[in-house]
């Protein structure tokens, strides 16, 4: 079963781009940079106009691991009637664009002999993996299990234990690339000069950034890790907003409806 995604609505949500920039900049600031680069930061993030192709493989109850994560956070576990988990095949070959700035450090003939401004553009990101998406207690958990072409899973119908919702193994991160392809273009030097100041394809820097993004996504989103989106925060904000509106307009009754449509 395949799904059509209203990608335009997602792409128009400015908070997604803002959160992506904040998250990646926080990670970049924590990196121990090699001696030939400094002051690296993200300057722009565009989700792109091309959506992933998603195929539903299985519907099941959420893994116990997700409930345990909620318990550790101190969240109360209510009824499970609306909790659900999907196993999906995600095929993404879109036009996401990431731009970064940095300074290339020349350490010859002496340390920090020269620093050149660098502009880096990351594009052509390709992902083709199996992914778990679980919705429980108004929270969404997303975790990538394996690359579709992984030979270790060629003869396995599902990475879920047939006797219950328990994932087989806890070291999937060791056998998943997740980002299968990535293109990095580098420009070095002042952008207003035209001769001899712009260098392209700086191999070491591009390889470093490629490894950074691949390792980051595997660390944060590949099983046994996951991305967690908490919609309870949005509900709390809506409640506070409604309370303020009722105080200013005591005779007005407000109602909010939420609906989500997926075309199979």
Swiss-Prot record:
GO terms for cellular component: endoplasmic reticulum membrane; ERMES complex. It is a peripheral membrane protein. Residues 1-232 form the SMP-LTD domain. One of its GO terms (biological process) is aminophospholipid transport. Keywords: Endoplasmic reticulum, Lipid transport, Lipid-binding, Membrane, Mitochondrion, Mitochondrion outer membrane, Transport. The keyword Signal does not apply. Its main location: mitochondrion. Residues 248-264 have a biased composition (Basic and acidic residues). It is found in: Mitochondrion outer membrane; Endoplasmic reticulum membrane. Belongs to the MDM12 family. Component of the ER-mitochondria encounter structure (ERMES) or MDM complex, composed of MMM1, MDM10, MDM12 and MDM34. A MMM1 homodimer associates with one molecule of MDM12 on each side in a pairwise head-to-tail manner, and the SMP-LTD domains of MMM1 and MDM12 generate a continuous hydrophobic tunnel for phospholipid trafficking. This is Mitochondrial distribution and morphology protein 12. The gene is MDM12.
């Amino acid at each position: 079963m395949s799904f059509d995604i209203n990608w335009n609505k997602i792409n128009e949500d400015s908070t997604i781009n803002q959160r992506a920039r904040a998250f990646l900049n926080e990670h970049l600031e924590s990196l121990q940079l090699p001696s030939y680069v400094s002051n690296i930061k993200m300057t722009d993030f565009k989700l792109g106009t091309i959506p992933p192709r998603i195929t539903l493989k299985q519907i099941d109850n959420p893994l116990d691991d997700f409930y345990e994560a909620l318990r550790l956070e101190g969240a109360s576990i209510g009824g499970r009637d609306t909790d659900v988990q999907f196993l999906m095949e995600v095929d993404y070959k879109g036009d996401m664009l990431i731009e970064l700035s940095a300074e290339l450090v020349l350490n010859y003939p002496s340390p920090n002999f020269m620093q050149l401004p660098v502009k880096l553009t990351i594009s052509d990101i390709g992902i083709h993996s199996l992914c778990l998406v679980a919705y429980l207690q108004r929270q969404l958990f997303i975790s990538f299990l394996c690359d579709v072409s992984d030979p270790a899973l060629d003869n396995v119908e599902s990475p879920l234990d047939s006797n219950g919702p328990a994932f087989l193994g806890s070291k999937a991160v060791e056998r998943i690339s997740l980002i299968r392809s990535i293109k990095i273009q580098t420009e070095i030097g002042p952008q207003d000069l035209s001769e001899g100041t712009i260098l392209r394809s700086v191999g070491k820097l591009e390889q470093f950034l490629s490894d950074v993004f691949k390792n980051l996504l595997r660390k944060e989103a590949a099983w046994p890790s996951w991305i967690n989106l908490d919609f309870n925060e949005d509900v709390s904000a809506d409640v506070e907003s409604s309370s303020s509106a009722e105080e200013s307009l005591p005779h007005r009754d407000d109602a909010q409806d939420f609906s989500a449509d997926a075309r199979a």
